[in-house]
Amino acid sequence: MSAVVTLLATGLAVSPAVAAPTAAEGKARVGADWAKQSVTFTAAPGQVNDLHVVPMDQGDGVRRIGFRDSVPLQPGDHCTYLEPGVETYVVCELPTDSARPDRIDVFLGDGDDEIATSDPGVATVSGGPGDDMLHAHTAHTVRGDAGDDMVMGRVVLDGGDGMDHLMAVDGDQFLWGGRGDDMIEAYDGKDVVSAGPGDDHVMGGDGDDIVFGGSGDDMLHGEAGDDVLVGGSGKDTVEGGPGRNITLP
């Protein structure tokens, strides 16, 4: 069990939480910090965002990242509107000769927001309060926060409070359901799942998974692979599936 705790701690430590800066009043703000090789997007209070973060062209010592939304944006340092008068599309630049890896952090704030990411530099996405659709396939860490959220990402998924649906992608991932009755789909890879409090439904998918049900009446399905399934307190249904499994109530 100590090895599992170490594994969980290692996964969380890769992309630490970042405090959200304050957005420009009335508009979401996106700006770059070349000293930190980072770009930060912060939604304005009361906005409902439909954000796309996309890679663009590269040249003259910089690469460009596009931020397209359904609401007006305010460009900060090293960022500008794609076209004059079009306030919903901002392009930011990062130098290509930095020793640091690119880091893009997105804070969506309140509202029922949506995001889709395809840029590989996305580090964290925080949905904030509201029922969010977070299709952040390239993001390392995705947090739904409060609300009934759809959460998708590359390494660490955290549903937060609410009835959330977490969907992993290929690879080894860490998935936390949080409080609420959650649906968690781990898919391929050696995944670690902690469903949290609530009546949760977990599907391990292919791979050797470790699944903790937590409190509540959970349904845990290891599916293919050599899985470890721990039900926790509550009236749980635990099924290992094909493979050499360890199941505990």
Kindly give the residue locations of the regions a language model identified.
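Right-handed parallel beta-helix
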Residues: 80-136
